[in-house]
């Protein structure tokens, strides 16, 4: 049997806020809101956000609070993209890899903007 990825699910304390962050960042519509569950994306694969009571955000690169998911997002203009993610509530993380910049989303999940 071959499976098909239908959703990448983020645990977080505020699924509505985190869904808005990624909806704005990726230009994907909110397609489902069901209490403490929110989906974005109208294709065969979506991002989903669920309320997790007592959620402890990762503190990358601290191994005591490891990352739980990691997205790499390709952008054409790193300067404009960085301004957008920071305005949406992201926090810049230390990163030294050429062509990548690390950030934490509003729930603390790390992600990278990549370019080039």
Specify the residue positions occupied by each region the protein language model found:
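Vicinal oxygen chelate
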Residues: 2-6, 28-72, 83-106, 116
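Short, surface-exposed ligand-recognition loops at beta-strand->loop->(often short) alpha-helix junctions
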Residues: 9-14, 74-75
């Amino acid at each position: 049997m071959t499976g098909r990825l239908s959703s990448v699910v983020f645990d977080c304390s505020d699924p509505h806020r985190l869904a808005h962050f990624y909806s704005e960042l990726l230009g994907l519509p909110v397609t489902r809101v069901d209490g403490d569950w929110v989906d974005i994306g109208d294709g065969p694969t979506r991002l989903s956000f669920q309320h997790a009571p007592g959620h402890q955000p990762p503190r990358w690169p601290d191994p005591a609070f490891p990352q739980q998911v990691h997205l790499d997002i390709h952008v054409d203009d790193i300067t404009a993209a960085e301004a957008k993610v920071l305005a949406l509530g992201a926090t810049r993380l230390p990163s030294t890899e050429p062509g990548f910049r690390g950030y934490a989303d509003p729930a603390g999940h790390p992600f990278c903007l990549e370019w080039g």
